[in-house]
């Protein structure tokens, strides 16, 4: 009986370790192809945290537009808080809608910045 119990515990331990390794590898592969300055898809950005997440986020519809958040709390905040839906373009200093903005990774920590057009995006990253 003792040997059977030890065998089961060993199997469970191997299974848990293999699941952990697989998730870590998947995360690295997903984020590997975007770097600072790259334009990223809206659906991979948490618009509440202003962060590139590397995978599809939760879709939130508001006033006929689509926003994205990473959790249930973000889904609640997007319709209620204007700063979850709007951002300032760093070049024009105009308030723009995140749902229609060009979104790019701004630093090595996967924070994002929003632009009202491609010309502003190019001006921002050419001056860095």
Regions found by a protein language model. Give the residues of each.
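Positively charged n-region of N-terminal signal peptides that target proteins for export
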Residues: 1-7
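Short metal-binding segments enriched for Cys and/or His
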Residues: 73-87, 119-128
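Short cysteine-rich clusters marking metal-coordination/redox-active sites
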Residues: 46, 89-92
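Short Cys/His-rich Zn2+-coordinating modules
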Residues: 24-33, 69-77
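Bacterial signal peptide processing site
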Residues: 20-22
């Amino acid at each position: 009986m003792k040997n059977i119990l030890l065998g089961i515990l060993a199997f469970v331990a191997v299974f848990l370790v293999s699941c952990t390794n697989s998730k870590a590898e998947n995360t690295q592969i997903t984020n590997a192809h975007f770097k600072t300055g790259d334009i990223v898809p809206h659906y991979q950005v948490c618009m509440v945290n202003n962060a590139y997440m590397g995978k599809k986020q939760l879709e939130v519809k508001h006033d006929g537009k689509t926003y994205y958040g990473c959790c249930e709390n973000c889904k609640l905040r997007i319709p209620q808080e204007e700063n979850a839906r709007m951002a300032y373009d760093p070049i024009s200093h105009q308030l723009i809608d995140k749902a229609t903005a060009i979104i790019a990774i701004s630093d090595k920590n996967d924070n994002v910045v929003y632009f009202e057009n491609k010309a502003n995006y190019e001006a921002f990253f050419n001056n860095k």
